């Protein structure tokens, strides 16, 4: 079937951007910056996202093959808030911003909402994600925290049923595994593995900074310039690897009893 130009993905994105008056620019570093300035609004919403989620379990980085345990992307999301200087949540508390993050199957996103100190909050966000810091000690501490989160989701019938459904549909694809992994899988993580992930996927060309509210595109771009993600850099050679999936479902039925 031929694809009409007005129905192409690029045309649809352009139409959607025009409908919400969204500006966009790709920086020399490869980072995409999206901005929707909203006159009359007091707050600013920002999201810094990478194309790296739970289904990425194997990749090559500059020719070296790397395998990840289940839950790596989610674990990394937690660790990005911590640096040698302290916890990013403490910095956000001083500016009055509300911050959070989430991991999906194919994305990891870091967000904040604030009504003031926009430049300072953007600096916290970009610096936090741009300067990862991992040690064996901090990883061990986080393993205990995330282990409790995993147990919490184990008590959710909806989440367990969704996971069971994916295990029915897929034989090998990593979507079969819980986004957070298991207590056993995250115990395999090391600083070297996490740094390999940030080198491969937390690079400007694989990320998007999206802002909206009482902010301009120039402000967002200037924040990128201040925090070292504006200028062109030589990207690493990265190839994501997925297992060959069967044409038939793994199982035809699933049942789950929650007591």
What does each of the following model-derived ranges do?
Residues 1-88, 195-259:
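His/Glu-rich zincin catalytic helix
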Residues 2-4, 84-197, 218, 243-244:
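Acidic/histidine-enriched segments that form metal/cofactor-coordinating
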């Amino acid at each position: 079937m031929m694809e009409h130009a007005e129905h192409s993905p690029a045309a649809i994105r352009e139409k959607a951007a025009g409908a919400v008056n969204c500006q966009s620019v790709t920086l020399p570093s490869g980072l995409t910056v999206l901005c929707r300035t909203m006159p009359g609004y007091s707050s600013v919403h920002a999201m810094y996202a990478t194309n790296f989620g739970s289904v990425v379990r194997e990749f090559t980085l500059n020719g070296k093959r790397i395998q990840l345990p289940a839950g790596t992307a989610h674990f990394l999301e937690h660790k990005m808030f911590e640096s040698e200087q302290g916890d990013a949540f403490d910095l956000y508390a001083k500016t009055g911003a509300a911050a959070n993050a989430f991991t999906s199957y194919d994305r990891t996103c870091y967000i904040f909402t604030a009504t003031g100190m926009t430049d300072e909050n953007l600096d916290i966000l970009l610096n936090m994600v741009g300067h990862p810091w991992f040690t064996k000690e901090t990883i061990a501490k986080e393993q205990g925290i995330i282990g409790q989160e995993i147990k919490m989701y184990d008590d959710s019938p909806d989440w367990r049923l969704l996971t069971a459904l994916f295990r029915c549909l897929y034989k090998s694809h990593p979507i079969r595994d819980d986004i957070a992994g298991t207590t056993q899988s995250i115990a395999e993580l090391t600083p070297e593995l996490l740094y390999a992930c940030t080198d491969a996927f937390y690079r400007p060309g694989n990320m998007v900074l999206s802002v909206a509210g009482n902010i301009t595109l120039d402000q967002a771009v200037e924040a990128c310039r201040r925090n070292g993600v504006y200028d062109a850099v030589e990207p690493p050679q990265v190839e994501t690897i997925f297992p060959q999936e069967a044409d038939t479902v793994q199982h035809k039925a699933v049942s789950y009893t929650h007591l």
